[in-house]
A protein has these predicted regions:
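Vicinal oxygen chelate
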Residues: 2-13, 31-32, 39-53, 57-117
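Amphipathic alpha-helical segments
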Residues: 14-29, 81-82
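Short alpha-helical
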Residues: 17, 47, 76
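Basic side chains
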Residues: 17, 28, 62-64, 92
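Short, conserved, surface-exposed binding loops centered on an aromatic residue
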Residues: 30-31, 59
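Short connector loops at helix/strand junctions that flank enzyme active sites
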Residues: 35, 45-47, 60-64
Length: 117
């Protein structure tokens, strides 16, 4: 049996707003979607797709999975996220190979921006 990772599903209250944020940030077009849901990409794409699923209320507590997004310039990446409605948490980690900052999307889902040297 051949198994393959096809995507990540994100629970959202405002599916349209959150999916639009990620579509611009990752330059991923909207694909065929079910009513009320939004898919970025398609399950047959070479890259895993992002699926945005509606939920009635926000989850309390920290989610134990997050996305990592590589950028060419960390400061421009931070500015882009903020311009799209996201937020910089203030958490920054400097390593020999690069820098990682923790960001959130418009609903507070944490993710990392990374610039490698």
């Amino acid at each position: 049996m051949a198994n393959r990772w096809v995507g990540v599903t994100v629970d959202c209250i405002d599916v349209e707003r959150v999916s639009a944020f990620w579509s611009v940030l990752l330059d991923r077009p909207r694909g065929p979607s079910e009513p009320g849901w939004v898919y970025l990409g398609h399950r047959d794409d070479p890259q895993p797709r992002l699926v945005f699923q509606p939920v009635a209320e926000p989850r309390a507590g920290k989610v134990r999975l997050h996305l990592d997004v590589s950028v060419d310039d960390i400061d421009q990446g931070i500015a882009q996220v903020i311009g799209l409605g996201g937020r910089f948490t203030g958490e920054r980690h400097d390593y020999d190979e690069g820098v990682v900052v923790v960001m959130t999307d418009p609903e507070g889902h944490e993710f990392c921006l990374s610039q490698f040297y």
